[in-house]
Amino acid sequence: MELWYTEKHTEYVKFSIKVDRELYTEQSKFQRIDILESKEFGKFFTLDGLMMVTEKDEFIYHDMIVHVPMATNPNIKNVLVIGAGDGGTIRELTRYKTIEKIDMVEIDERVVEVCKKYLPKTAGKLEEERVNIVYEDGLKFVRNKENEYDLIIVDSTDPFGPGEGLFTKEFYGNCYKALSEDGILVNQHESPYYEYYAKSMKDAHEKIQGLFKINKVYQAHIPTYPSGHWLFGFASKKYDPIKDLNAEAWNSLGLKTKYYNTDLHVGCFALPTYVIDMLNENKE
């Protein structure tokens, strides 16, 4: 009997991957955790049946959520990551020797433990000495922080279940307060393509836009995420991700990446017309 993983993207669209075997399943206090293995995408990790990470395409997401802000401000020293239980964002951040401290706030300790065991490719740097993992709701954690971080990365699940509070006006306001005077906020911004995800994207952008002087959106193609067309939000008190890109400084680091490069950095902010129109709806 064939086993297939299937994720519903809309009432009329489903996405499927043929599964070789199920490696692990658990119902944690917060959500269902599954690790599956496939020929096409290698091992992959889902929460409540929704795709989080595959070994084959995770590099795209993690390159883009980390290297875009780091190339914009190479002097980032203190970083807060909210979510990111699979460890891929942390892996990319630890490649920067100039970063002094990384606080990672993950609501579900079981996600981290399971990923350490089954996904060492992404979770291999979670025990690095600069990384401090706190098991707490990110919404609560950030309430008590002020002028502490140069970069906040919101590597969250979708805006329901455990990740719901990470898409609220209160949360983004507390992130603003927690950032230093030249701080940067980057978040996964959902997909603009299907109506359900597009609504979440517009809601998040509207809230961030009301707080940060500089607020932009950039994109990447991630094959296993709904529609494949995925957005990220870039918001800052000081740095413009295009005007302030220090390509020479970043390239001099000699970091080998599979997706990100400094030419792509500029190009990824050039959005399709339909996305621009959606974002402009908030201004009308």
Curated annotation (Swiss-Prot):
Gene Ontology biological process terms, A to Z: spermidine biosynthetic process
Annotated GO MF terms: spermidine synthase activity
Major location category of this protein: cytoplasm
Organism, scientific name: Clostridium botulinum (strain Eklund 17B / Type B)
Known pathway: Amine and polyamine biosynthesis; spermidine biosynthesis; spermidine from putrescine: step 1/1
Catalytic activity: S-adenosyl 3-(methylsulfanyl)propylamine + putrescine = S-methyl-5'-thioadenosine + spermidine + H(+)
GO cellular component annotations of the record: cytosol
Enzyme Commission numbers on file: 2.5.1.16
Protein's cellular compartments: Cytoplasm
HAMAP family: Spermidine_synth
Protein name: Polyamine aminopropyltransferase
Residues of the active site: D155 (proton acceptor)
Family the UniProt entry places it in: Belongs to the spermidine/spermine synthase family.
Keyword Cytoplasm assigned: yes
Subunit annotation: Homodimer or homotetramer.
Binding site for spermidine: H62, D86, D155, S156, T157, D158
InterPro entries reported in the protein's UniProt record: PABS (IPR030374), SAM-dependent_MTases_sf (IPR029063), Spermi_synthase (IPR001045), Spermidine_synt_N (IPR035246), Spermidine_synt_N_sf (IPR037163)
Stated role: Catalyzes the irreversible transfer of a propylamine group from the amino donor S-adenosylmethioninamine (decarboxy-AdoMet) to putrescine (1,4-diaminobutane) to yield spermidine.
Record key words, sorted: Cytoplasm, Polyamine biosynthesis, Spermidine biosynthesis, Transferase
Domain PABS: 2-237
PROSITE patterns named among the record's database cross-references: PABS_2
Gene name in the database record: speE
Binding residues for S-methyl-5'-thioadenosine: Q31, E106, D137, G138, P162
